[in-house]
Swiss-Prot record:
Gene this protein is translated from: hb
Region annotated Disordered, chain positions: 18-96, 118-158
UniProt name for this protein: Protein hunchback
UniProt biased composition (Polar residues): 41-50
This protein's record includes keyword DNA-binding: yes
Cellular compartment(s): Nucleus
Amino acid sequence: WYSSMFAANIKQEPISHHNHHHHHHHGHHQHQQRHNSNSNASSPHQSPLPNLQLEQYLKQQQQQPLMPPGLPNPMQTIMPANMRPSPTARTTTTTAAAAPTTTAAAIAMQANDKLQALTPPMDVTPPKSPAKTQQSCAEPEKEHDLMSNSSEDMKYMA
């Protein structure tokens, strides 16, 4: 019974880890696509503004279906080929596609913020803590070694 439960835990753990890794990679990839589309649309580089502009633009597109066809191109670059809005179901497809892109970009940006927030302490603390421990451990050892060496040298010298 214990071995079977342990094997089940072993089986379950890599699966969950793989799913988490795949989800994070997908969110990051979506964020890269969104960044490229924003640069094509020549929108500001700050992260909150493109989301708001994209939502406002989609609302405008729903209210005014007679806009030029060149404007939805940045949106089409984000969506897969099967999700591209056809002229008949443009409003429903854009509203359905607006939520996943914004949420995926928000998740990716949150993940990037978490990574950026976590990496500097992780990069800074390991050099500090081993240096502190090495210094605190090495200084008494140095003094002790100097004392023992000097006393031994004195013994051997005498």
